[in-house]
Amino acid sequence: MNFEFEREIGFINSQPSLAECLTSFPAVLESFQTSSIKDSTAIPPPFEHTIPSLSPCTGNQARPRSQKRTASNGLQLRTQTAPPTQHQQGPAPLSGGAPLAHEFPWMKEKKSSKKCPKPGATAAAAAASPSQASSGYTTAGLESPTEIQGGLDNVSGSRRLRTAYTNTQLLELEKEFHFNKYLCRPRRVEIAALLDLTERQVKVWFQNRRMKHKRQTTHHRDGQEGEPSGFDLLEGTDASSPYSSQSLEVSGSGSAAPSESETCPTTAAYTNSSDKSQPTPEEGQASQPEPASVPDTAVHSPPYPTPTADNPTTMAEGRAAGPEHSFTEPQDATSLPDLNFFSTDSCLQISDALSPSLQSSLDSPVDFSEEDFDLFTSTLCTIDLQHLQF
């Protein structure tokens, strides 16, 4: 009768909650600073008085006094009998010697909402007996999961550490990237198992490597557009040299030395092979000239001369068009009174270094074939540079 009377007066819920028990201990209130616990202080004191079987120690002492006085007013007497329980059970949570409590359903729901319920589950699994259950579980079972959870939140909120790849792993990944910029999933799994990496690490490494390759390619392309390299210039001269390596025809009028223009068609090729050759004006009334850079004092020297202000260059007449950087504007012959031409001896020295097939082609007005031109350009590249006089 006493149990039913106190249930109707003190407890609205059908099952008592452990949160009501927490309000009666000052030590627990100091350690637990959540708002939900503070709001629950208006709820009556713990349920050991209503269910004495859960706490046999307090039931033997507080129960006889409550049975005598609950007939007059049960609610007031329960508030009076609460202070003795504070002094009796206050040292028990601090000692930590009490075993842990049984796990209730509301505890399971609270832990399932958290990310890592394993520490709380292991603490609850170590419960031995239900004696002094509420007070023991208050300190050991509820405070430690909260502290552990706070530590886990700090760890998960921190930045993930970078993967430290070994030299062997980097070498294998670079080799694979050289052949395949994109990996299919079976190959990615195979590489991850081979290099002792996770599939995610291999995928992220290839993503970063593709971005690095893209940046390098874009930067290299921008540099190519701004300033062409020497290899590109060499290719440009090779492409323009067939036009200048064609055999020359002698024009009837305005030709100072017809035989020289026939026997020295290679001077135009030397002009093209030198990338920084300067344009020179034409001589005479020819409409289709061919440039040739030759200094005054170095008539006997091999090719690759560089024209200077003291050494003006000469222009031979011919049918083939000159390179793009040569001038085609005609000028009067009187503007260049002291021009020296290639002598036949220097042309013969140049032609001696060439193959016999090229020597025969020099004498004929027929254009060079592709094979002769390839051999001609290779011979120009292998001329001894020790005899050059700049």
Curated annotation (Swiss-Prot):
Can you say where in the cell this protein is located? Nucleus
Note the DNA-binding span(s) on this chain.
Answer: 158-217
Which InterPro entries is this protein grouped with? HD (IPR001356), HD_metazoa (IPR020479), Homeobox_Antennapedia_CS (IPR001827), Homeobox_CS (IPR017970), Homeodomain-like_sf (IPR009057)
What GO molecular function annotations does the UniProt record carry, in alphabetical order? DNA-binding transcription factor activity, RNA polymerase II-specific; RNA polymerase II cis-regulatory region sequence-specific DNA binding
Question: CDD domains per the record?
Answer: homeodomain (cd00086)
Q: Which Gene3D superfamilies match?
A: Homeodomain-like
GO terms under cellular component: nucleus
The record's listing under PROSITE patterns reads: ANTENNAPEDIA (PS00032), HOMEOBOX_1 (PS00027), HOMEOBOX_2 (PS50071)
Q: What family is this?
A: Belongs to the Antp homeobox family. Proboscipedia subfamily.
Q: What is this protein called?
A: Homeobox protein Hox-B2a
Q: Which organism is it from?
A: Danio rerio (Zebrafish)
